[in-house]
């Protein structure tokens, strides 16, 4: 984390998200403060808590993407949840503590991936030995000389153990050398693969306890294996992953996952405006109950998970909402106070759409060009055509519902629909997208307000 200053974090975010400078600065400062906190005296460190962020802005302007890219940048555990999925304690539905359990699971996957990468060489060496075992076994079972089939039953010409061991060692040495030289990649072998246990209850509402029980039973019960016939090339990554899993110190992984979730975890609470209350009708009371349930998690509490107790005191919470029908002040005062940093995100303009289409590392135009390029159809967009697409997106957003940058996906699909359908049967060709090409396919629909509501 210490590698990135706030300015560098903003520059990294600029590679993926256009505009929204205030939001980027806010999350960059919050992230840097985490690093600063680690440098403090331990007695003071526990007193410094993250300053949670409330993002206010319409859909499709980059709220979620900023948080997701931020987490990816520093390899922090990240989970996105929707406030509307939760119900008040005592009702059927997901309880708010499940967001912390989800974060720990995300942290566990992150730590496991890192540990497996570090163990990859050792795991691959063990996997190669298993492949050699399979190859030697296959050679032995087919018989070297194809002699009398009754020899196996009566042992008439069985070799002495010393000779058998020497021959096996010689065989293994030859096969190992051929394997490392890549001569046996297409050879078929029989390997025993551990069957993955089906997670019956994961993600189901109200089933967290049963998921924990299933996990405990899975550790006690013997693991099932299934024999599969694969080529050496196909078997190697499967066996390597299996061996890496065995080499993991699960206690160490669990401890690190919990530590990272507590100290670096980011929870993105979307649609928080939907649980804001105005009146005191029954629905309003229920939504207020959800807010009061979320409050202790954000304030700092301990949640019991199957990996041990997890403290939420130093997790960073980023809440977001459009706040069309409600205001931030409609949230209960205690919850408002837990999100001291408020950032308003701007609606996207025509110029923003042009930048979104062209500037990010994996810009939308680059994606479509690559997709069609896979069929040897090479597409180029003129600058005027890009401007035309951006203009139509801004126009439709203004005249109908404003869905931000997601409007570009709809329009791009309409523009390239015919080409995408025909590309597989076309010879290698170059296609230039002009403003007229764009207007021929979406112009009439964009201009007709009734049609654009249903189609774009």
Curated annotation (Swiss-Prot):
GO terms for biological process: protein unfolding; proteolysis involved in protein catabolic process. GO terms for cellular component: HslUV protease complex. InterPro entries: AAA+_ATPase, ATP-dep_Clp_protease_ClpX, ATPase_AAA_core, Clp_ATPase_C, HslU, P-loop_NTPase. It comes from the Bacteria. Pfam families: AAA, AAA_2. HAMAP family: HslU. A double ring-shaped homohexamer of HslV is capped on each side by a ring-shaped HslU homohexamer. The assembly of the HslU/HslV complex is dependent on binding of ATP. ATPase subunit of a proteasome-like degradation complex; this subunit has chaperone activity. The binding of ATP and its subsequent hydrolysis by HslU are essential for unfolding of protein substrates subsequently hydrolyzed by HslV. HslU recognizes the N-terminal part of its protein substrates and unfolds these before they are guided to HslV for hydrolysis. This is ATP-dependent protease ATPase subunit HslU. It comes from Exiguobacterium sibiricum (strain DSM 17290 / CCUG 55495 / CIP 109462 / JCM 13490 / 255-15).
